[in-house]
């Protein structure tokens, strides 16, 4: 049964798919130009060109194209005249000789076709002849049906459909994906029932054999060129073992002494059962090859490893035992005695009190307080922390968390005695005096400092400095050259120069009149003529 083949009218094709109900109302004037795209906002002429000249008619070309060299325009890097090239390249087109009327006629003469293929819609879907002449694109559903064998009318079954059906085959791919199968596992299979049929007789093809006509004179045989290192030499590949089938020997064969394969012993060293043969040798690739260990020469002793008993007998060093190691690396004083820095000496504690986080006085003050700073389960742990320092029992701190130990140490440090706080913040006068004495003794004994050159320079202030302090220039505008007085070995002369009084300076230089050329001042009449009121 065919569908209606009548062509649809243009009214049905271009009919709006929705039903309009009611009368549309006009938008507000302020909302008419809303949502206009950018390409509609550009000023173009009737030929869709941006060629408006003049500030009041668009100003696009006048403000952009004709502003070469300005900030808003295009700045050429190199200029080259194209006067001669334009003559050869330029050619007349039909648009150059057409006016507005010609363009209007050309626009009317154009033929527009609808994108909707109305002819194809009237073709029945089951007519194969008309479907061949149709030129529309197939839909996605039709493409999927064609891939399944649909030709437009019914499904065509391929003759090779049964050839590609999955069959139950034995899995022999033991080598895995991405690897190549080994020839060892490909056991040879003898054809069953073929050897009995190939016994006697010959065919009639021997009588009809011409011999010469079927022979190719250009036949050179199989290609002898191979991608091997050797040519015309068949290289024998030695297999690790020869695959053998399980074979049962009858009594008749055993009596005649026939044996297909020489029997071998099993892995346990015993011969196989009568009538059976071992398939794999003992030296199969599945067994690991164990090589004998290297022979150790006589008298050899290891150098990198010591006796294992030495590790258990060795004890950890205490802080007092490690102290000489740090002292050797420290600087030595003038007497040759090793001296540690102050921070190292302060951190070194005795072995007995190395575990203590607070001193005993701080623990007593914190224990004497009746109000416990903690109200939860930490209150009991805090008392155990203080009792461990008072009773000198470090084993009580083993079960306390490290975070609680840090928190209890900061809490107990608030009850540290005042003398302890002052000693940590200030330095005693005895230590300060010893440092000064060490500096003085070092300066007195060091003769290299006295042998350095010293200079005595007369102070000549700058002119701006004298002006700021309202002091006259001591030497005038001409600055004298500074005289360097150096003495390396004569120390008494240096002392005399340093103790020289100010009176020894030459006073004649101070009392010398200033040689400043003063310019004549302008007369008063000039100022009155300029700034005076008439």
Swiss-Prot record:
Protein origin, superkingdom: Eukaryota
Biased composition (Polar residues): 310-321
A Pfam family matched in the record: DUF1604
A molecular function (GO) term: protein-macromolecule adaptor activity
Positions of disulphide bridges: none
GO cellular component: cytosol; nucleus; spliceosomal complex
UniProt-annotated location(s): Cytoplasm; Nucleus
InterPro entries membership: DUF1604 (IPR011666)
Disordered, as annotated region: 310-346
GO BP annotation list: mRNA cis splicing, via spliceosome
Keywords: Cytoplasm, Nucleus
Protein name: Uncharacterized protein C20H4.06c
Taxonomic classification: Eukaryota, Fungi, Dikarya, Ascomycota, Taphrinomycotina
């Amino acid at each position: 049964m065919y569908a209606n083949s009548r062509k649809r009218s243009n009214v049905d094709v271009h009919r709006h798919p929705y039903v309009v109900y009611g009368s549309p109302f006009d938008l507000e004037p302020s909302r008419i130009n809303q949502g206009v795209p950018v390409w509609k906002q550009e000023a173009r002429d009737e030929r869709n060109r941006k060629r408006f000249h003049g500030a009041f008619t668009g100003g696009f070309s006048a403000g952009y194209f004709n502003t070469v060299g300005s900030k808003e325009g295009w700045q050429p890097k190199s200029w080259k005249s194209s006067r001669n090239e334009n003559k050869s390249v330029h050619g007349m087109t039909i648009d150059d000789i057409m006016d507005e009327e010609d363009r209007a006629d050309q626009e009317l003469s154009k033929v527009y076709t609808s994108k909707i293929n109305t002819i194809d819609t009237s073709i029945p879907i089951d007519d194969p002849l008309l479907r061949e002449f149709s030129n529309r694109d197939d839909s996605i559903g039709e493409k999927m049906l064609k891939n399944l064998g649909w030709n437009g009318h019914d499904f065509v079954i391929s003759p090779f459909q049964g050839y590609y059906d999955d069959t139950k085959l034995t899995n022999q791919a033991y080598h895995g994906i991405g690897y190549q199968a080994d020839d060892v596992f490909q056991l040879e299979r003898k054809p069953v029932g073929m050897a009995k049929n190939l016994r006697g007789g010959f065919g009639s093809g021997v009588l009809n054999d011409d011999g010469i006509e079927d022979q190719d004179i250009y036949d050179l045989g199989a290609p002898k060129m191979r991608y091997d290192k050797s040519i015309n030499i068949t290289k024998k590949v030695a297999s690790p073992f020869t695959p053998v089938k399980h074979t049962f020997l009858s009594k008749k064969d055993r009596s005649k002494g026939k044996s297909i394969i020489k029997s071998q012993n099993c892995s346990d060293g015993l011969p196989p059962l009568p009538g059976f043969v071992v398939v794999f040798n003992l030296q199969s690739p599945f067994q690991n090859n164990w090589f004998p260990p290297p022979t150790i020469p006589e008298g050899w002793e290891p150098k990198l490893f010591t006796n294992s008993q030495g590790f258990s007998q060795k004890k950890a060093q205490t802080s007092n035992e490690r102290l000489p190691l740090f002292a050797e690396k420290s600087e030595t004083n003038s007497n040759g005695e090793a001296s540690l820095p102050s921070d190292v000496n302060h951190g070194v504690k005795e072995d007995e009190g190395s575990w203590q986080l607070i001193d005993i006085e701080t623990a007593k003050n914190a224990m004497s307080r009746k109000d416990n700073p903690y109200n939860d389960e930490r209150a009991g742990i805090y008392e155990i922390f203080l009792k461990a320092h008072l009773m000198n029992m470090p084993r009580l701190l083993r079960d306390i968390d490290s975070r609680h130990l840090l928190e209890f140490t900061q809490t107990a440090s608030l009850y540290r005695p005042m003398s302890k706080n002052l000693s940590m913040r200030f330095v005693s006068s005895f230590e300060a005096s010893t440092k000064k004495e060490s500096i003085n003794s070092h300066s007195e004994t060091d003769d290299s400092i006295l042998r350095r050159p010293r200079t005595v320079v007369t102070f000549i202030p700058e002119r701006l400095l004298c002006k700021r302090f309202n002091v006259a220039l001591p030497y005038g505008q001409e600055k004298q050259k500074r005289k360097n007085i150096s003495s390396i070995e004569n120390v008494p002369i240096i002392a005399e120069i340093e103790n020289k009084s100010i009176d020894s300076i030459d006073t004649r230089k101070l009392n010398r009149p200033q040689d400043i050329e003063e310019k004549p001042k302008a007369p008063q009449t000039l100022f009155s003529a300029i700034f005076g009121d008439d």
